[in-house]
């Protein structure tokens, strides 16, 4: 990862090429032209972008790390299917901090929409996303802990005509977080949180970019050995890394993430406020299933 970043930094930052329209879904389209894209990503790392994967396109992405919790594989993933140019259905892991204190993403199903505003230079694009949380259960002795987060996102994306290598992202995440204890202890609590989120993309060349994001996220807090009831607060999650398109339909990414306990951190703590960090490697695959089905069987054609 470091070698790729250094080589990219040595290269002159070229502007991103103008987005081109996908090849029409026709029976005579070549396989090479179908897989040439373009294939926009609908995410930074965990933050949604104001874009969808495109009509009749499926994307599968994931990343994992062994460093965040020694001896345990922590991972997150996304499966999205585009229907039309502005909508996609998805199953994904949304960011949250579990009672164990680590960034343990929670499963969710939802829909993401791009607001249909004509693309113009220096005019932001906007998107919304709704994610219905799926409960995740952790077991501590005879106590079951169930954590759920349901989210609504409003995000924006801005590209500059004079600096096409730079893309800014920002928005807000409205989360309804719930924690429930069962088994030998009974307790239930929920809280609504408004969480700002932001990020950026720096295009180093037409196939590689540096990506960063920072956001507040729900944090579940409970000590199984204590007598206090669980509570829901918020923590800060940041991530910085690269994304490299080996071919248009397949990208690799690597990133360094960190976690700050906002509730207990003092303004002058500096780096000591970081309570967790990790290194994650991942990939994203785009499958233009509509164009492939049209070429093979004459269905889903334009």
Language-model segments: residues:
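Short loop-to-alpha-helix "cap/lid" segments that border enzyme active sites
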Residues: 189-191
